[in-house]
Amino acid sequence: MKNLFVLLVITILLSACSPETSEENATPIGDWRHHGGNHNSDKYAPLDQIEGGNFSELEVAWRYRSPDLDLPKDLAYPTGDYRAVPLVVNGIMYVNSNHGLISALDSATGKELWVFDPKSYELGPPLFFPLQTRGIEYWTDGEIERIFIATSGKQLVSVDIHTGLPDPNFGNNGYVDLKQNFGRLEFEMNNITHGAPPIAVGSTVIVGSKIYDFSMINRSPPGHVRAYDAYTGDFKWRFNTIPQAGEFGNETWENDSWRVTGNTNVWTYMSADEEAGIVYLPTSTPTNDYWGGFRLGENLFAESIVALDIETGERIWHFQTVHHGVWDYDVASAPNLVDIEVDGKAIKAIAQVSKTAFTYVFDRITGEPVWPIEERPVAQSDIPGERLHPTQPFPTKPAPFDRQGISEDDLIDFTPEIAETAREMAKEYVLGPIFTPPIVRGSNGKRSTFVVPGAGGGANFPGATVDPETGIIYIPSATLPHGMGLVAPPAGTSDWPYTIQMDTQIGPFGLPLLKPPYRRITAIDLNTGEHVWQIPFGKGPADHPMLEHLDLPPLGSVFSDVVAEGGVLITKTLLISYLAQRDEIDPEAHGSILVAHDKMTGELLGEVLVDQRLHGPPMSYQVGDKQYIAVAGGGRDDDNELLVFALPN
C-alpha cells in the first residue's frame, strides 16, 4: 500500500515538471541527473530565477536530516564531512548518506518518500574513518530507471527509483560483490573500499575504488576499474590501471614491479561522452606515493587520463600528467567535456584540471592536445635507489591557474619583521620549481622539500565547472603547500625503506609562508586558452594582528580545516560557491557563507549567511516555476543534513 502511495505522489510530481530539454546534454532543464549535472561534468544549471539582484534574499526552503542519525549506535560508524551530491530526476530528489542509505524526497518540500538501506555497516568497519560516501548514479534506458551506489561494504547495488527496493534482476537480488573479479588477489583486500559514485552509460556500470594511501606494508591492491551489465549485474570487463603481463604499458614498470604495486586507482568522479561511447578515467598515484625506488619507470597508467570504450573497456587513448609520480599529484577530479572552437576549428574537447595547477586540454575523441604539451627537464632525486623521470609534461596553454614552485621572491613580506622571519624559516627547506623532488629528512641540513602546490592544493576533487554556452572553465584552487621529507620507518613496522613525514601550516607568526592569494577562482576561455579573470576567494588572514593595520584586500581563504570544499556551480548568470565563516568572520564561528559572483567578470554580487558548515558540491534544480540550490553540510558532529535554498514565496 505504501509503495502505491509513493507511485501516486511521483506521478503527480512528474506532471508538474517541465519536459523542456537542454540541447547540450539531453537532460531536462530543471533536472540534475548526475554528480556533475550530466556526464559531461559541466556542473551547469541553465536557470536564471536566482540572479545577482536577488541572491542575498535566499533563505532555507527546507532541510533534510540524514537517516544515518537514526541508525542504532551499536551499528553506525563515525562519519566525516557530508559531501553527497543530490540528484533530481523528474522532480524527485535522490540523495545518499555517508553510510550509503538512499533517500527519495519531494524536491519542493523535502518530504521523505522512501529510504533504502544497503546495510553495509553489517559487513564490518569501513577502511577510512570517518566514513564518507560522496554520491550515487542515475541510469535509465528510457523505460527502466535505477539508482546505483558503490558502498563502503564493497557492494554495487541497483535500486528501483520508484519503489526504493533492490532490483531482483541485478546480481544477487540487487547486489553485486565487488570483492570478485578484481584480478590479482595476493594483497590485503581490506585496503580497498568505495566512496565516489559509479558511472552508468548505455548498458554498462563502471566502478572505481578508494584505496588507503599510507600503507606501511606493500600489500595495497591495484586500482583496476571494473564494469558490469546495468540490467543483470554480470561482470563485463576490467581495465588494469597497472598493466599486467603482455598488456600495453607493462614495460613502464621495471623489475616486474607491476606484480606487487598497488593503488593507481580511480577514487574520484568519472565523466563520459555518451554519443561517442567513451568513459574518461582520472587515475591516482601508485603505492608509496612519495618514494618509487621499487617501481622504476614511467608507471602507466598512474596519474593519467584514460579514455576507454564503454562497452568493451578497450583503451582508446591516454595521457599521463606526471611520470613516475612521487608528489601525490593524483588526477583528483572528473574531467570536463565541452565543445569549443579554436582558430576556427570545432573541437569536441576534454579539459582536466589538476593538483599541479595545470589545465590539460585535448580532443576528447582522439586524445590530441589542443595546444602543445612540452616535455621539459626537471630536477632529479639523490635518494638512494630512486630514479625520477628526466622530464615532465608542461602545457603551453592555458597558463597555470595557481602558484607553482617556490623561490625567495614568493615569501610573505608584508612587513620587514614578517619578511625576515619568513626568510629564516625558509632556510630549513629545499625551495625550487614544480616537480622538485622530496628529500630524506636532514639531507644537507634541510627538513624537507617545500612542495607547491601541495598534494591537497591546486585543483582537488571538487574539480572545475565549464559553461557549455561560452566554453569558459571556472577553476577553484588552493595553494596549500607543505614540506615533504622521507624518513626511515621504525624497525619492523614497514617493508619500505622510506615513509613520508609532512610539514604543514608552515609560516611566520601563524601566517602562511607564501605571499597571497591562498585560494582563488580562475576563469579561462577554452576557445583561446587565455585567462578571462582571476580573483582571490575569501578574506584570508587580512585581519591578523600583524596585518590589520595595512587595510589589505581579500587574500584568499587559507582553508583552516579542510583541503578542499565543494567547488563551484554556474547558472545562466552566476558562479556560486561558499566559504567557511571561521575563515571569514570569526575563528569560533560554525556556519558558512553562500557566495555569488558574476560569472563573466568575477564581481561579487551577493552573500547569504548559513548556520551550518557546508561541505558538498552545490547543485541547482527547478520544480514548476521555482529554482532551488542544494548543498550537503555537517557530518562530524552528528549533524549531517541537506540544506535547500530558494527565494521567498
Which residues are covered by each model-predicted region?
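Repeat-blade elements of multi-bladed beta-propeller folds
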Residues: 32-36, 78-101, 128-155, 190-217, ...
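C-terminal motif of bacterial Sec signal peptides marking the signal peptidase cleavage site
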Residues: 13-16
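Extracytoplasmic beta-rich repeat domains
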Residues: 64-85, 115-141, 172-197, 212, ...
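Beta-propeller blade signature
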Residues: 159, 163-164, 221-234, 295-314, ...
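N-terminal cofactor/phosphate-binding cores enriched in small/glycine residues
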Residues: 39-142, 147-179
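Bacterial signal peptide processing site
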Residues: 18-20
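Structural motif
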Residues: 155, 162, 216-224, 291, ...
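Phosphate/diphosphate-binding loops
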Residues: 334-383, 634, 644-647
